[in-house]
């Protein structure tokens, strides 16, 4: 995988930094694992904007990724690695011994031809998925479930991982990249190793148009708006907003805690590190 800084042949190329992976499949994705992906433009069923800065972008197919890894005891071979426009990580097309194909997240170091497996009898190596009760303490894992059988929810982005730091009774304690320490049932599954494509963080799009290709619309500052649109809006000439930074709905936006799910507080051993 190479990080390439483009030559400044134009204003739009001057700041572009690309991540090029020659191992990725250059053809079309596997048609049997594609689904339609309709664009919402950030609107809900009433037509109102519920998510700002969303709209446009290149048409995409959704790749159906296996986050449950519940095909136990059947070895699988990695056929190829592919780009996925719906996530920062790359995905791997795997062929099971019984003929079924599935997409999974590509782990760091995974290559075409590798053998992987799921289940309690799987070997302790990158790409294999096991319940947390069968994973040694101190191991680095990704794609971790929060509820048994629900599918992976933690550590799915490019370059992310979680460390298993303890196991006590029915729960395993995980250290997340944010510094948070969290308990998860030991029957939840996780995949060994880190998520691949860690160089994704070095990428620079270089121009506004590249954001638009990805369906991201411009972000307008509150101080540039009118009073009807934002608490920072209005004033004669340029102003600083006149109050502590808030969202368009008046909620403080710099370090203000908004977590309100008290039901799951008991699973958080330590909150994340302050930046």
Curated annotation (Swiss-Prot):
SUPFAM superfamilies in the record: Nucleic acid-binding proteins, Translation proteins SH3-like domain
InterPro entries registered for this protein in UniProt: NA-bd_OB-fold (IPR012340), Rib_uL2_dom2 (IPR014722), Ribosomal_uL2 (IPR002171), Ribosomal_uL2_bac/org-type (IPR005880), Ribosomal_uL2_C (IPR022669), Ribosomal_uL2_CS (IPR022671), Ribosomal_uL2_dom3 (IPR014726), Ribosomal_uL2_RNA-bd_dom (IPR022666)
Region annotated Disordered, chain positions: 223-275
A GO term, aspect molecular function: structural constituent of ribosome
Protein origin, superkingdom: Bacteria
Gene Ontology BP terms: cytoplasmic translation
Disulfide-bonded cysteines: none
Pfam families associated with the record: Ribosomal_L2, Ribosomal_L2_C
Key words of the record: Ribonucleoprotein, Ribosomal protein, RNA-binding, rRNA-binding
PROSITE patterns tied to this protein: RIBOSOMAL_L2
GO CC field: large ribosomal subunit
Family matches, as SMART domains: Ribosomal_L2 (SM01383), Ribosomal_L2_C (SM01382)
Function according to Swiss-Prot or TrEMBL: One of the primary rRNA binding proteins. Required for association of the 30S and 50S subunits to form the 70S ribosome, for tRNA binding and peptide bond formation. It has been suggested to have peptidyltransferase activity; this is somewhat controversial. Makes several contacts with the 16S rRNA in the 70S ribosome.
Family of the protein in this entry: Belongs to the universal ribosomal protein uL2 family.
Subunit organization: Part of the 50S ribosomal subunit. Forms a bridge to the 30S subunit in the 70S ribosome.
Protein name: Large ribosomal subunit protein uL2
Organism this protein belongs to: Shewanella loihica (strain ATCC BAA-1088 / PV-4)
Lineage: Bacteria, Pseudomonadati, Pseudomonadota, Gammaproteobacteria, Alteromonadales
């Amino acid at each position: 995988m190479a990080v390439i800084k483009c030559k400044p042949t134009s204003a739009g190329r001057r700041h572009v930094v690309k991540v090029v992976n020659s191992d990725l499949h250059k053809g079309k994705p596997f048609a049997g694992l594609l689904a339609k992906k309709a664009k919402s433009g950030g609107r809900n069923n009433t037509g109102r904007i519920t998510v700002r800065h969303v709209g446009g972008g290149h048409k995409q197919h959704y790749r159906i990724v296996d986050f449950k890894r519940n095909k136990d005891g059947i070895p699988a071979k990695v056929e190829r690695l592919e780009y996925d426009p719906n996530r920062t990580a790359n995905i791997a097309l795997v062929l099971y011994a019984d003929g079924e194909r599935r997409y999974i997240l590509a782990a760091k170091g995974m290559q075409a031809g590798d053998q992987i497996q799921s289940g309690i009898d799987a070997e302790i190596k990158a790409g294999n998925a096991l319940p947390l009760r069968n994973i040694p303490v101190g191991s680095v894992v990704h794609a971790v479930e929060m509820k048994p059988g629900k599918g992976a929810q933690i550590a799915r982005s490019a370059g992310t991982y979680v460390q298993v730091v303890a196991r006590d009774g029915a729960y395993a304690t995980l250290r997340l990249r944010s510094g948070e320490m969290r308990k998860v049932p030991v029957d939840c599954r996780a995949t060994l190793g880190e998520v691949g494509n860690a160089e994704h963080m070095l990428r620079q799009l270089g121009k506004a148009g590249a954001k638009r290709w990805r369906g991201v619309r411009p972000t307008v500052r509150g101080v540039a708006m009118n009073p009807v649109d934002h608490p920072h809006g209005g004033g004669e000439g340029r102003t600083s907003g006149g109050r502590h930074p808030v969202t368009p709905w008046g909620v403080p936006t710099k370090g203000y805690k908004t977590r309100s799910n008290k039901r799951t507080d008991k699973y958080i051993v330590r909150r994340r590190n302050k930046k």
